[in-house]
Amino acid sequence: MTIVKNPILTGMHPDPSLIRVEKDYYIAVSTFEWFPGVEIYHSENLVNWKLVSRPLNRISQLDMTGVPDSGGVWAPCLSYCDGIFYLVYSNVKSIYGFFKDTPNYLVTCDRIDGDWSDPVYLNASGFDASLFHDTDGRKWLVNMVNDFRPWKGTSGFGGIELQEYSCKEKKLIGRKQIIFRGSSLGVTEGPHLYHIGDYYYLITAEGGTGYDHAVTVARATKLEGPYTLSPHHPLLTSAGHRELPLQKAGHASLTDTDDGRWYAAHLCGRPITEHSRCVLGRETCLQEIVWTADGWPTLKGGGNLPRDMIEVPSNAVQERSHKAHYRFEDETLPFEFRTLRIPLTKQDYSLTERPGYLRLYGGESLCSRFHQTMTAFRQEDFSFIAKTVLEFYPDNFQKTAGIVHYYDTINFLYLFLSWDEDRGRILNVLRNRLREQSYPLEGGINLPPEGKIYLKIEVHMEHSTLSYSLEDTEYIPVYTDDISYLSDDAYSEIGEYRFTGAHIGLCCQDTTGERTPADFGMFYYEGIADTVE
């Protein structure tokens, strides 16, 4: 047996959908406005996980042009039946006010790392859609229903809807019905159905994806219900226990092992500040499940609080260090890199124009929801060093390039090169804290007219230092900040909702429209070990 420390996937890895195929385990997670859509991890031991697939990698599968911050791909459902992998996902177009526009789609593939199909449209009545394969060969879709009538008292969550899916016709068929209205916790979402023994089990998330989050279990002898709430409700929550290291526990999925054990994957948040801000976003954890004599799933060890240490049946040693050094020697972007909303095209970047460099052609501003030129790496550690080397020769103040600690279009900290008509090349900082924009260095720092500039972000928990160097030796600090505002929780403090996580991006802007290029010679990221654990 091996002791595994939670979370098993650090940084932004929310809404885990966990399955087993023979001896292989897979977890699919939400990606929101980041492209490619959905990330799928593989493990042979439940201990160490490797990113193996980013299935929604074509515009024909996923076009998120213009989607709001924290829109896009919500809560994918990964499943497997008769040699085929199925992936259901939402592409959320709007999320504010009473209404949410949430078209749901299905793609398939015979290999987890293969080319997934173009999507089949399913419905748009709500989000968190999940496909269930019953033992009789029929397939069913469940999703929460968005009820935009406030006088109904549902807070927008109208219950879990069930409808049959026809593989032959590639559409939903038959009548729709609400099979579960939820418990008193409310905000019933994230459904997954399982047929285990004599019962259908419905797993849902409740309480909202914050500090009151929870996992609810109900069961029925018939698929259509009625569903009875577990006497051990909720299965999992950290609500009311702010002393726990794992907060926001909820949105779970279940699988068994080949030796008969059961596990649940769920999301969590780890607050590190007095304001209870989770700077790494919502992460993925694992809990062992045991079944009662009368057939209810419960946490091993009793109670319903998430454990930060669990046992798994393996002799593998957990790997928790994160270090990457990209030198841009290939002709494609590194597999781990992401872009915003849509893929970069050959008009946006090149890895061949100058071998050994990533050339980014200036695009729209960091506030754009349409066509930014940015590629980013997820922050996976509370403390880290990230740096790059940049060659950039702007001739207009509207041309900028650099390294950005990015949450979304109105929440980022940007260290960049630009140009001033009186001083030539300059280094500056743009701080966009929840729409409050400022230039802390005012006019910036003069730079030599030619040559490379090394840029570095160093973060220790919530404390960030931006610095630069001309030789990659002695770095000169230019700005320090409390960057805990790059979090879901900072939005909650002002009455708004976000669901993603911080990234470190390389980017280039040219709002003259001339698409002036910037050349990046490398990207380096290393988690600092004293806070990784």
Name each region found by the language model.
Residues M1-E533:
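Carbohydrate-active catalytic/glycan-binding domains of CAZyme proteins
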